[in-house]
Amino acid sequence: MTIKSLALQCRDAAQVLSQLSADAKQALLLAMANALDTDATQILQANQRDVDAAREKGTGAAMLDRLTLTPARLSAVGAALREVAVLPDPVGQVTRDDVRPNGIRVQKVRVPLGVIAMIYEARPNVTADAAALCIKAGNGVILRGGSEAIHSNTAIARALQGALREANVPEAALTLVEDLRRETMLELLQLSDIVDLAIPRGGEGLIRFVAEHARVPVIKHYKGVCHLFVDASADVDLAVRLLVDGKASRPSACNSLETLLVHADIAERFLPAAAAALRARNVELRGDAATRAVLPEIAAASDDDYAAEFLDLILAIRVVPDLDTALAHIRQYGSDHTEVIATQTPANAETFVQSLRSAVVMVNASSRFSDGGELGLGAEIGISTTRLHSYGPMGLEALTVERFVVRGEGQVRH
């Protein structure tokens, strides 16, 4: 079957989804979560095939971490689906309701987007998360994962499609593209009369390919070059906690820290404490000359290091003379994802927040909170770095649009 035929079937199924009640969608998502539990053994076996193949190819540690499903991680995926199931249904929400002077009643109402193409790499959890969010919001979803996770994605999709069938919902509402040739992805991205939105999640190469070739609207989930700026007034212990959590808790995540900026007035107090805490977590440090004056044992950082999304236990460090220099550095090297300031000066915190265009800005909180679940959205479909209708972590509302519904009693415009 051609990709166009698959997309047409998904569009037809999306029409069925859009008519389901909130209760029906909740029951469907709970059944999908249960299906993951029922098929857990097969899913984990399929994932092991992908992990073994990736190891044989010499895949890096960061990619392997994103690819790997453990029983605990798979259980967490199911738990995320259950959380989405009980979230308020955005479809049908009235966001504006007023009566015009001529008597017509004007409402703005949330409706599903339609068909969403999710294009991603080695994150099998995205298969379930994206399906759950799209279906909860009444959308059909076309999933095109990476070849690294093909067995995992197929096993997860089959389990979820089984739940759709049992609920008498066309399984095409969740369509997994198994033809992973780039030509097929290119054809999918050209289907502007069928696909309403494409969301790429993955490496820079994938996102650039989608953005450059798509004829459908694209919301990019670009790389996360995330910074922590430690201001002169920062509480050292607090800042060290933010740094260790942001860098070492899960370095392969896009909301992990990649660069540390330290105000010169606090560098001699903060850097030794930070280095000791990071070394205990096996983090490699690279710094500029001012950093190495305090930490002479670390390697020198290059311009490429400051622009890098390491997704690994590596951190670039720079000492800056003031807040303005820190902001200029972030504007030059950042990716509009997530930025953090540690400070006890409210005015500096406000300047930091107002001066950056990043999707998420944190004050005295870990970058790892830049996540749909942590911000109260339930499972997220990704973190948008595109300034369109959604910016930052994308939950259910971001997968709907508002339209006008107008009710009258025969009014005409003269």
UniProtKB/Swiss-Prot annotation:
Native species: Xanthomonas campestris pv. campestris (strain ATCC 33913 / DSM 3586 / NCPPB 528 / LMG 568 / P 25)
InterPro entries found in the cross-reference section: Ald_DH/histidinol_DH, Ald_DH_C, Ald_DH_N, Aldehyde_DH_dom, G-glutamylP_reductase_CS, Glu-5-SA_DH, GPR_dom
Similarity field: Belongs to the gamma-glutamyl phosphate reductase family.
Protein name as it appears in the record: Gamma-glutamyl phosphate reductase
Amino-acid biosynthesis in keyword set: yes
Entry EC number(s): 1.2.1.41
Pathway membership, UniProt: Amino-acid biosynthesis; L-proline biosynthesis; L-glutamate 5-semialdehyde from L-glutamate: step 2/2
Subcellular location: Cytoplasm
Xref: NCBIfam families: PRK00197.1, proA
Top-tier EC class: oxidoreductase
Sorted UniProt keywords: Amino-acid biosynthesis, Cytoplasm, NADP, Oxidoreductase, Proline biosynthesis
Family matches, as PANTHER family: DELTA-1-PYRROLINE-5-CARBOXYLATE SYNTHASE, GLUTAMATE SEMIALDEHYDE DEHYDROGENASE
GO molecular function: glutamate-5-semialdehyde dehydrogenase activity; NADP binding
Functional note: Catalyzes the NADPH-dependent reduction of L-glutamate 5-phosphate into L-glutamate 5-semialdehyde and phosphate. The product spontaneously undergoes cyclization to form 1-pyrroline-5-carboxylate.
Glycoprotein found in the keyword field: no
Lineage: Bacteria, Pseudomonadati, Pseudomonadota, Gammaproteobacteria, Lysobacterales
Listed HAMAP family: ProA
GO cellular component assignments: cytoplasm
GO-annotated biological processes: L-proline biosynthetic process
Catalysed transformations (reactions): L-glutamate 5-semialdehyde + phosphate + NADP(+) = L-glutamyl 5-phosphate + NADPH + H(+)
UniProt cross-references to Pfam families, sorted A to Z: Aldedh
